[in-house]
A protein has these predicted regions:
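PLP-dependent amino-acid enzyme catalytic core
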Residues: 1-180
Length: 180
């Protein structure tokens, strides 16, 4: 699990042990000699977003969060929904209209409430901020919450451990940039 690096993740205690679903330490395969590919689609919810979600939800569990909200257009929402389900935290994911029905089904499959918001992703974020003010929900924002990044940084620790060296170049998928 990525929590082999928990000492570097700014987490209190060992609540992560009850949250983790074995994310991290994904295989690295050689492609064309000097190019290596890290297989982060082999995470519990099929996305590198599990790295951040596992750590963020561990923090939420440690501080006693009962309900969270998040804006997402897909993978982060699925990951947060999954880890909240494992942790017993109520979860609402606000998605913009046009979000893949499969992503919505995955979010709901983990027991979270998926709410389609007319407009853009920014409108979803506005709804989440209002839920924080009105209901006291925790905003599990995967773009700005530093605990999400505490998890995604395990990517490079793993890469170093697996290759036994620092790669000369790293090319990563960006999405909205949460792994960068």
């Amino acid at each position: 699990s990525q929590f082999r690096y928990h000492a570097f993740m700014n987490l209190d205690g060992d609540v992560w042990r009850r949250v983790s679903m074995g994310e991290g330490m994904t295989p690295i395969v050689s492609y064309n000699g000097n190019v290596f590919l890290k297989m982060d689609f082999m995470m519990p919810t099929l996305s590198f977003k599990d790295r951040g979600a596992a750590t963020l939800v561990s923090h939420m569990k440690a501080i006693g969060v009962k309900k969270c909200v998040q804006d997402s257009s897909g993978n982060a929402g699925v990951a947060v929904a999954a880890y909240c389900a494992r942790s017993g935290i109520a979860c609402e994911i606000y998605v913009p209209e046009g979000t893949s029905p499969n992503k919505i089904a995955m979010i709901e499959g983990f027991g979270a409430k998926a709410v389609v918001v007319p407009g853009t992703r920014d409108h979803c974020a506005e709804v989440c901020r209002s839920k924080v003010k009105e209901e006291g929900a925790y905003y599990a924002n995967h773009v700005y919450n530093p605990y999400f990044y505490e998890g995604t940084k395990a990517y490079i620790y793993e890469t170093f451990e697996q290759l036994k060296r620092i790669p000369r170049h790293i090319f990563i998928e960006l999405g909205n940039g949460t792994l960068f």
